[in-house]
Amino acid sequence: MSMWIYFQGLDPSVLPGDPAGFEALFDVEFDELRRRVRAGEAVWLETGFFQLDEIYWSRGDGELPVFGGRQVPDPAGGPGHVAVDPPDVVRAAAYLERVSFPDLWEDWRQRQTPAPDEDLCDRLVRYHENLRTFYARSAERGWAVAKYFSF
């Protein structure tokens, strides 16, 4: 089973407010999603994003979780969507700029049994850098972020 999460930066005036609006935003050809990622308007994460969320939460300092936001439930029972308003995008960008991923990884890795492999570390480093760049760009533009989950 394929699992992924897609983050889309957008002007807050067009941030969907209901499940149908989110479905319309993300109901595009895969090539369009890839174009958005290449243009820096979006980020796509696959295997490992659950672990990355745990790593960010391990700080325990009450920062906005990068994967958090306002839940928009799916009436059909799917994973739903998440909306992040511009002030929280700024907070997430500041958090990602401030944290040391190697330190977070080491703290998290020491609590795992069995120890995670280096392939996972390499993937999560790339995800962290992609998210850091994406949230910084979105914050600079005053954007909101819409998230689409697929499980």
Residue ranges and their predicted role:
Residues A136-A144:
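Secondary-structure boundary elements
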